């Protein structure tokens, strides 16, 4: 392990090569583990970036919570695919855990009707049969997303239930399952999802919109290499159509995280 110096103990840092996140306190006191040595003398290079927008967002959210009387709140982080939702949501969760607040991070990617590969096939089928207007009427709607299922999760959380059934979706056929999850002691539910600002989603107390552009999301999707067709013309057009809808849904946001990292009210 190598310990770092001069960091902010309460801040969250992103290690750029691995994508892992660490608190400043952990890096200074416990350190970062080194990979196994393959030869006698070996050099390693790490690059850490402070996720400043996460700290700023945390402060804004805490100010909002001070005026909120609910014991349990749902905060959604929504934006384009590859806009940084997962990175920001994970860092925000760490801030809550650091101050002793029970916080659960839920991914909306578990709630389409079909696994990603089959959903892409359905998107293509809709496009071939009904054109771009048909595709626009499919993306992010109840035809693509099981909004009833995720709305039930948010309703159960608000009702104070300590055990809630969550859905888990893999990337291959048959990889869809349900699991009872313990929510006792959880007062903040973070939902990170492209469709977290949809009018069909009910139960969100504070929607947070992440600004992005199709060009940026394309670059990030390719870089993270989650899907083989991330750079295909069809998927790029899907991302553009989703971005059109997101620009309409930004009106639902209580807070906006700008491309420059600034956090502001609309």
Annotate each PLM feature:
Residues 51-76:
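Extreme N-terminal, non-catalytic leader segments
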Residues 226-266:
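Small-molecule kinase domains that catalyze NTP-dependent phosphoryl transfer to phosphate-bearing small molecules
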Residues 25-52:
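C-terminal beta-strand-rich structural cap/linker in extracellular carbohydrate-active enzymes
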Residues 1-9:
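Carbohydrate-binding surface patches
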Residues 104, 111-170:
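Conserved nucleotide-sensing/catalytic segment adjacent to the nucleotide-binding pocket
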Residues 85:
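Conserved lysine of the Walker
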Residues 88:
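Hydrophobic positions on the alpha1 helix immediately C-terminal to the Walker A/P-loop
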Residues 175-224:
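ATP-dependent NMP and nucleoside kinases share a basic, alpha-helical "lid"
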